Amino acid sequence: MSLPKKKIGIFAFFLLTVFTITLKTYFSYYVDFSLGVKGLVQNLILLMNPYSLIALVLSVFLFFKGKKAFWFIFIGGFLLTFLLYANVVYFRFFSDFLTFSTLNQAGNVESMGGAVSASFKWYDFVYFIDTIIYLAILIFKRKWLDNRAFSKKFVPVVMATSVALFFLNLAFAETDRPELLTRTFDHKYLVKYLGPYNFTVYDGVKTIENNQQKALASEDDLTKVLNYTKQKRTEPNPEYYGAAKKKNIIKIHLESFQTFLINKKVNGKEVTPFLNKLSSGNQDFTYFPNFFHQTGQGKTSDSEFTMDNSLYGLPQGSAYSLKGDNTYQSLPAILDQKQGYTSNVMHGDYKTFWNRDQVYKHFGIDNFYDATYYDMSDDNIVNLGLKDKPFFKASADYQSKMKKPFYSHLITLTNHYPFTLDEEDASIDKPNTGDSTVDGYIQTAHYLDQALEEYITDLKKKGLYDNSVIMIYGDHYGISENHNNAMEKLLGEKITPAKFTDLNRTGFWLKVPGKSGGVNKEYAGQMDVMPTLLHLVGIDSKNYLMFGSDMFSKQHNNVVPFRNGDFITEDYKYVNGKIYSNKDNELLTEKPKDFDKNKKQVEKDLEMSDSVLNGDLFRFYKNPDFKKVNPGKYEYKSGPKGNEKK
């Protein structure tokens, strides 16, 4: 006699479980997670991304028969639900998603316990109502279930469909956000495009890779690096050593700034009139016109990383995302331990971007003023976040109340791709290159220059200018090689590979209290900032592992390596396997005498720096001048301006 049709078969129970977990995931996307979903494509991706892993995991249990199949599907569904809800609770408290590295930090686990009790919402039953119903059926209504096995020959079809759905999801995601998995900008981006379950798998794979690399490392590897970097160390310049002891340090990041803008006019108007003044040598600032960015795929995050650690970023991906839980001996922590500085970062975007909320803890940064500390009303936002003028104004107000001496890093945003600006903020006409990116870049750079001038004026009014080291720099290029045709129109010259390397100058301006300004033509890069600042405040650098050299030192190394292995010196540049003269950018027919030595040094620098990151070698370093940072003691709470926008 056949069983009644109303009974629930194993495959039907599987589909029901997949469907209800997916519904709960959608619910979390729109109610609990702030993912910044925009447009039709991103909403379609959001609809698609939970299915693949849920179905793949639960389909394994279709191989079982009878009661076992139902119970295994139920348990698998419960574990996925638990993972989802754990992320919901964690996100409510930390505005981020759970990772294996955060779970391994005792401080985070303890905070999580408090977060659960503090973060319950009245609607949380939604996450478990299906679990309760299924459990009741399995215990009390077993007669509703059809225990006949699901045909095993169809299980691989279900699995293959799940895998195909994942790759379709990934294709859509890569179309909307290229290099999603290689650059890993932000956990929110990964969850938005892949879903929380695939994100957990991705994080697990990366954690295993990192742990394997660390497991192979030893103190011997550290010794090799220390011996190498000690040979590179340069003696400080007595004229500058200790000149800024216990002075505030204000580090200003000019987003996507390139120095071809200095003294550049468009339609008869200066693009950067304020920076032009600072570059003249007649102001309080020393200008380094031959200062280059040294970033890789991590762009802005690489710039921050390099300048605070004197290490190179990774050859692929971002060190912030992939090596964020390493041990470091960073500039903020050294300043704190040696001279009692408090440190902070100020940024008009949310704290999870580039994994900053985790990385900064390992750098020993005390406070993080993210978007929740600023007025993020629509009038104040453009492109990726807060406009530079309101950002600088609010930041100066915060700085005027800070304990001194402080180390404060301000990260601007308006001069960021795609370089769009509200009409009321545009005060210079665009050029007419026919390329909206290049044309817009002129307007946003002009706005940035105005905002910077207003900020410096504010510092003077608040009594912070005279007693502060002020450092201004561009983080990376803004205009890529894809826009060479438009750049040729703008600059009136051909953009060759050699010329494009010249355009990687991003500028460095430094004001040291009590010192007159000028123009310093040394060739330098972001790697050199940390040793320079340590010497300026009078901290001996001999026991710190750094790859850069003091820019004021008479022994300063004028070879500037790039992350891809290219490099530039005072006389020539090595680009894509070819050597060009700096005078005219023409190919050299003979190798310079010091070329092989310099090339070998660049390769060794990159190799050694990579070994520090991949092996997490600082964990082995018993530095008499440094106490290891405990990331668990740092917590970056949201500011008074409220929660993140949905």
From Swiss-Prot:
Extracellular topological domain residue ranges: 29-43, 90-119, 175-646
SUPFAM superfamilies referenced in this protein's UniProt entry, alphabetically: Alkaline phosphatase-like
Record-marked site positions (Cleavage): 217-218
Biological process annotations from GO: cell wall organization; lipoteichoic acid biosynthetic process
Residues that bind substrate: 416
EC number: 2.7.8.-
An example molecular function term from Gene Ontology annotations: metal ion binding
Pfam family, one: Sulfatase
Transmembrane domains' residue ranges: 8-28, 44-64, 69-89, 120-140, 154-174
Enzyme class, broadest EC rank: transferase
Pathway: Cell wall biogenesis; lipoteichoic acid biosynthesis
Function field: Catalyzes the polymerization of lipoteichoic acid (LTA) polyglycerol phosphate, a reaction that presumably uses phosphatidylglycerol (PG) as substrate. Is required for staphylococcal growth and cell division process.
Family matches, as PANTHER family: LIPOTEICHOIC ACID SYNTHASE, PHOSPHOGLYCEROL TRANSFERASE I
Family from the record: Belongs to the LTA synthase family.
UniProt name for this protein: Lipoteichoic acid synthase
Species this chain originates from: Staphylococcus epidermidis (strain ATCC 35984 / DSM 28319 / BCRC 17069 / CCUG 31568 / BM 3577 / RP62A)
